[in-house]
A protein has these predicted regions:
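Active-site beta-loop-alpha junctions enriched in small/polar residues
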Residues: 7-11, 36-38, 74-77, 120-122, ...
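Histidine-acidic metal/acid-base catalytic patches
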Residues: 1-5, 13-29, 63, 111, ...
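A general structural signal for short secondary-structure boundary/capping elements
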Residues: 76-80, 116-117, 142, 230-232, ...
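N-terminal pre-domain/capping segments
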Residues: 1-109, 180, 215, 263, ...
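Short, solvent-exposed loop/turn segments at secondary-structure boundaries
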Residues: 43-47, 84-91, 126-131, 195, ...
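Catalytic-core regions built around general acid/base machinery
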Residues: 52-64, 138-146, 197-200, 231-235
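Active-site acidic/histidine proton-transfer and metal-coordination neighborhood
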Residues: 61-64, 78-180, 190, 263-265
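Short beta-strand segments at enzyme active-site cores
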Residues: 32-33, 69-74, 112-119, 153-156, ...
C-alpha cells in the first residue's frame, strides 16, 4: 500500500548523477525532484534556457540511475518570499507562470503525475486578504494547467507561508476547491502544533514529506523525533492513501537543517516507518 521515494536534494553536496545513484543504492525506485533556483541538481533557470536538451538529459540521468520521478517540486525564488506565487507584481506573476509551465512540461516528460509548489507569503505592502486572494487565484490556475496535463498539483504549507498553521492551511483549502497538500508535519510541529492537529490535514494529502522533527527544530534525527508517525500512518491507511511517502531530509544552512547525517537518517527513518507499517498491517 505505501510507496517510498527519496528527495534528490537530500544530498546536495553530490553532483546530480551521483546523488541519483545514491538514492537508488539506498533502495529507492522513485525520486522526488527538487526544481529549485538554489539546487545543485535541477535548475528551473537552466530548464527555461534550453528546455528540450535539458529535459532529455534529465530523462537520461533518471534512466541511468534506474529511477522514476515521484514528484517535481518547483520553487522559483531563492527563498519562498522571492518571486512567490502571489507576488504583488503582475509582471513577476506572469514570469512565474512561464517557469511553472516549463516545470509542468518536465513533469509530463519524465512521466511523473505529481507536482508540488509553494502557496505564497504575506507581503508588507499588501493587505493580507489581497495576498490570500492572489494566492488562491494563482493556485487555481496551476491546478487547472496540471489537470489538463494529467498531473496532480499540490501545495506544501510551510513556515513563513500563508499556510503556516493547521488552521490557516484549512482556511486556504476552503478557498481553493479540490486543492491537495504535500504534507510535511515538521513545519507545524516545529511551530509548536501537535501531531494530532496535523492529522486533521491527512484527508487533503496527495504526497507526504517525512523526516524527523520536534518543537523548535524543523529537522532532527530519528532518535530525537517527536512527530507521531504511527498516528500518521494509521490515518493514511484508513484513508486508503495511494501517494508516496517521500524521505525528505535536507542539507542546508537554514533552521539547523545541516546537522544530520542524511544517509544514515534516511535509512533509519525508512526502516522505522516500514516496521510501523508491518505492525499496522498485522493488526488489521
Amino acid at each position: 500500500m505505501f510507496k517510498f521515494s527519496c528527495a534528490d536534494f537530500t544530498f546536495p553536496v553530490l553532483e546530480r548523477t551521483a546523488a541519483l545513484k545514491l538514492v537508488k543504492l539506498l533502495g529507492f525506485d522513485h525520486v522526488d525532484i527538487g526544481l529549485f533556483v538554489r539546487s545543485t541538481h535541477f535548475s528551473p533557470i537552466d530548464l527555461q534556457a534550453a528546455p528540450q536538451s535539458y529535459t532529455a538529459q534529465v530523462l537520461q540521468d533518471l534512466d541511468d540511475a534506474e529511477l522514476r520521478a515521484s514528484d517535481v517540486f518547483v520553487q522559483i525564488g531563492v527563498d519562498p518570499s522571492e518571486r512567490a506565487a502571489n507576488d504583488p507584481s503582475s509582471d513577476i506573476r506572469i514570469k512565474n507562470r512561464e517557469v511553472f509551465l516549463r516545470a509542468l512540461e518536465l513533469c509530463v516528460a519524465v512521466r511523473c503525475n505529481h507536482l508540488t509548489g509553494l502557496p505564497g507569503v504575506f507581503h508588507s505592502t499588501n493587505a493580507r486578504e489581497r495576498d490570500l486572494e492572489t494566492a488562491a487565484e494563482e493556485t487555481a490556475w496551476r491546478m487547472k494547467e496540471c489537470a489538463c496535463a494529467g498531473v496532480q498539483y499540490s501545495i506544501e504549507p510551510h513556515v513563513g507561508s500563508i499556510c503556516e498553521e493547521v488552521e490557516s492551511a484549512r482556511a486556504f483549502l476552503r478557498r481553493v476547491e479540490g486543492l491537495t497538500l504535500t504534507l510535511d508535519y515538521g513545519h507545524f510541529v516545529m511551530a509548536g502544533e501537535s501531531s494530532a492537529l496535523v492529522h486533521d490535514l491527512l484527508p487533503f494529502a496527495s504526497h507526504i514529506h517525512v523526516r524527523g522533527g520536534a518543537p523548535d527544530r524543523l529537522q532532527t534525527s530519528v532518535e530525537e523525533n517527536a512527530i507521531d508517525f504511527t498516528g500518521m500512518l494509521a490515518g493514511l491507511k484508513q484513508l486508503g492513501f495511494d501517494g508516496f511517502l517521500a524521505l525528505e531530509y535536507v542539507w542546508v544552512d537554514w533552521n539547523g537543517c545541516n546537522r544530520t547525517d542524511n544517509v544514515s537518517e534516511t535509512v533509519l527513518l525508512r526502516r522505522a516507518l516500514e516496521s510501523q507499517i508491518r505492525r499496522l498491517t498485522e493488526a488489521s
